[in-house]
Amino acid sequence: MTLQEQIMKALHVQPVIDPKVEIRKRVDFLKDYVKKTGAKGFVLGISGGQDSTLAGRLAQLAVEEIRNEGGNATFIAVRLPYKVQKDEDDAQLALQFIQADQSTAFDIASTVDAFSNQYENLLGESLTDFNKGNVKARIRMVTQYAIGGQKGLLVIGTDHAAEAVTGFFTKFGDGGADLLPLTGLTKRQGRALLQELGADERLYLKMPTADLLDEKPGQADETELGITYDQLDDYLEGKAVPADVAEKIEKRYTVSEHKRQVPASMFDDWWK
């Protein structure tokens, strides 16, 4: 088995999918998991990007079906901007599409800035822009878990195969969640699910960005990665990609393995 095939298997990628079938499977997963855990529903941060839009709509469909079947579940969508988000219109469009039971907004700026100032005062140096970006992601995680803990809700994560293969998420930030309904999907497959669900094309054709950096606001994921999502998707779907691209992907996969595992102990062998 080639490394490409090993990665596809590890990340549960299917080269060809039926969007209707995938939607059904993922809604059922959300329903089954919330019932099994005894939780009261879900909470998810909504950025206005493709991934949170898709996960949010799946979550809302799941809780509606649970209620229609005589159960009780709620979905809360939470906006988590840092000051003014330049694509706020997209976030509002996403909320209109998702139609969450409840939605709220929590500006993380005062929390992030207070932490950054305290860090500088105590340690005598400023956080790098990259590290501050990770703090933003982790404050967002803390906020979602505060809401979830207060209301008995599970935190949904938006990680999918194209992020997982590169480790393109913040450890214990956007990587911190209770369940991952998008696991196994490539970026283009996620777009196909949104199309099937009737989303405005603006929500899945926009340039993907983590938007965590103050010095490079709105920087494209592809710029930061040095790899395009089409290349990642082709690789994950078992297609041929240029040798240098495959090498980049495989290197990122190897060095980011710790992000896809629980914290290492001396009894684990995945890190050896």
UniProtKB/Swiss-Prot annotation:
Keyword Translocase attached: no
Leading EC class: ligase
Top-level taxon of origin: Bacteria
Name used for this protein in its record: NH(3)-dependent NAD(+) synthetase
Quaternary assembly: Homodimer.
Family, per entry: Belongs to the NAD synthetase family.
Gene: nadE
Signal peptide start-end: none
Keywords from the UniProt entry: ATP-binding, Ligase, Magnesium, Metal-binding, NAD, Nucleotide-binding
Binding, Mg(2+): D51, E163
NCBIfam families: nadE, PRK00768.1
Provenance organism: Bacillus cereus (strain G9842)
Annotated metabolic or biological route of this protein: Cofactor biosynthesis; NAD(+) biosynthesis; NAD(+) from deamido-NAD(+) (ammonia route): step 1/1
